[in-house]
Regions:
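ABC ATPase nucleotide-binding domains
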Residues: 224-251
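Helix-to-loop junction immediately C-terminal to a conserved catalytic motif
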Residues: 62
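The feature captures the beta-strand-to-loop junction immediately N-terminal to the Walker
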Residues: 47-49
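H-loop/switch region of ABC-family ATPase nucleotide-binding domains
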Residues: 192-193
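Conserved ABC ATPase "signature" region
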Residues: 110-128
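Conserved ABC ATPase signature
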Residues: 132-136, 140
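Catalytic Walker B motif of ABC-type/P-loop ATPase nucleotide-binding domains
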Residues: 157-160
Length: 251
């Protein structure tokens, strides 16, 4: 049971299910009785094949979807960084973009600019605060989305496929920020099938398969399971290409 009185748990998911209609007029379970807890300050990596339910689960946690059954409890505001970071950028410059998000919470004027500047410094974009947003690289756009979330006081951040379409330098920049945020106590949940790029940063690893949570443990425990288990999950054990858990991070 999550101990919210002591603020030990950032996210508690209990018995969450969600169904949708299929082409034949029946229904299928996109999520099936999923339960887990993520301790406050953790860095959790969630993996699984496309269609496993991981993105749907996280939109439910962020409050953008409702479960058909079960419940979600969070101990702080949860921000979601979408795979397509462009969809979250509404300002013509990074400073305008972060201020726009703050304006929706009632923070405007000099207070908004101060908070936005602080957040942009934290993600390494302050020097580009007045540059056109559309000129930012893919990694910079993800950092801008994170800056907007930080400025609004979110203490838990979910990132959906944060390495999608990034080159090596972009991955390193995102991982550097992930490491800094984790060290500062922010709870992070990373949804990715590219676990070789970040698993060494994590202290929690979960795998979804066809809407079911099939593994919930430490990265080392998951990596120690046999090849048949990974084949059943439909994802590739990165230790087939990398020597140790410590090497599973691009930096």
């Amino acid at each position: 049971m999550a101990d919210f009185g002591k603020e030990a748990v950032a996210i508690e998911v209990h018995g969450v299910s969600k169904s949708f209609l299929n082409a034949e007029g029946g229904s299928f379970k996109a999520l099936d009785e999923v339960s887990f807890a993520i301790p406050k300050g953790s860095l959790a990596v969630v993996s699984g094949q496309n269609g496993s339910g991981k993105s749907l689960l996280m939109t439910i946690i962020a409050g953008l979807e409702k479960p058909a059954s079960g419940y979600i409890r969070t101990n702080s505001k949860v921000g979601l960084v979408f795979q397509d970071a462009d969809s979250q950028i509404l300002g013509e410059t990074p400073l305008e973009d972060v201020c726009f998000g703050l304006s929706n919470t009632g923070v405007r004027g000099s207070r908004a600019k101060d908070a936005a500047s602080k957040a942009l410094k934290k993600v390494g974009l302050y020097e580009k605060r007045n540059s056109p947003s559309h000129f930012l690289s893919g990694g910079e756009k993800r950092r801008l989305a994170i800056a907007s979330i930080l400025a609004m006081g979110f203490e838990t951040i979910i990132m959906d496929e944060p390495y999608s379409n990034l080159d090596y330098a972009g991955v390193k920049d995102v991982n550097r920020l992930i490491g800094d945020l984790s060290a500062s106590g922010v709870t992070l949940v990373i949804l990715t099938h590219e676990i070789e790029k970040c698993l060494a940063l994590a202290n929690k690893f979960m795998v979804l398969k066809k809407g079911c949570l099939v593994f919930d443990g430490t990265p080392l425990a998951g990596l120690s399971l046999g090849a048949e288990t990974w084949e059943d999950w439909g994802i590739r054990n990165p230790l087939l290409s990398y020597p140790t858990l410590d090497s599973l991070v691009w930096k």
